[in-house]
């Protein structure tokens, strides 16, 4: 997978008690939201703190008017610390905050910025026309990767045939 919308924007289907059939939501969720949601649905009430990036989307499942997920991190962050041979073919990270998405390539620090509300296909790179937004998102992304000691890209590392300790050189 990669952090382009075609790699991360996929349908999610869930069923269960008190969840009405046929509801739809445009609120984005990530894999990190599953544990808090399942725990919330099961009645777990202790806070996870900032050890878990995700948040519960139970209220979205129960109430179509709910539009937010309370997460420990601001925005949605994706990290691909290796060359994967898929669309982008290079190690990269991304942050989505509100309508904007920043993609940062780790081999040369190239930045791409998209307004997803107007350009879901990610064809119009706004990196040169929105420098303030670009810088703010890059700062937030870099701070997060450092905070969580995200695996750092090294030349020659791919997702195949490498021991995990070779991939895990941290920020």
What are these regions (language model features)?
Residues 2-3, 20-21, 27, 32-35, ...:
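C-terminal cap/loop subdomain of S1 sulfatases and analogous C-terminal strand-loop tails that border
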Residues 12-13, 49, 60, 155, ...:
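Residues at secondary-structure transition points
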Residues 15-16, 78-80, 153:
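Tryptophan-centered motif/residue detector
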Residues 22-23, 69-72, 123, 153-156:
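Short, hydrophobic secondary-structure boundary micro-motifs
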Residues 1-19, 30, 170-171:
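Histidine-centered active-site microenvironments of extracellular/periplasmic hydrolases
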Residues 34, 108-110, 116, 121-171:
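Long, internal low-complexity/basic segments
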């Amino acid at each position: 997978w990669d952090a382009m919308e075609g790699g991360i924007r996929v349908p999610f289907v869930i069923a269960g008690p008190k969840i009405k059939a046929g509801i739809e939501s445009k609120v984005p969720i990530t894999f990190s939201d599953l544990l808090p949601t399942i725990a919330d649905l099961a009645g777990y009430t202790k806070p996870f703190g900032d050890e878990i990036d995700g948040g519960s989307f139970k209220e979205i499942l129960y109430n179509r008017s709910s539009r937010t997920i309370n997460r420990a991190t601001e925005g949605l962050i994706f990290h691909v610390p290796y060359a994967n041979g898929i669309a982008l073919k290079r190690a990269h990270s991304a942050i989505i905050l509100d309508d904007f998405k920043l993609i940062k390539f780790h081999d040369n620090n190239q930045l791409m910025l998209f307004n997803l509300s107007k350009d879901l296909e990610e064809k119009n790179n706004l990196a040169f026309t929105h420098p303030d937004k670009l810088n703010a998102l890059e700062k937030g992304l870099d701070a997060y990767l450092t905070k969580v000691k995200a695996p750092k890209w090294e030349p020659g590392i791919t997702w195949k045939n490498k021991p995990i300790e070779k991939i895990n050189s941290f920020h």
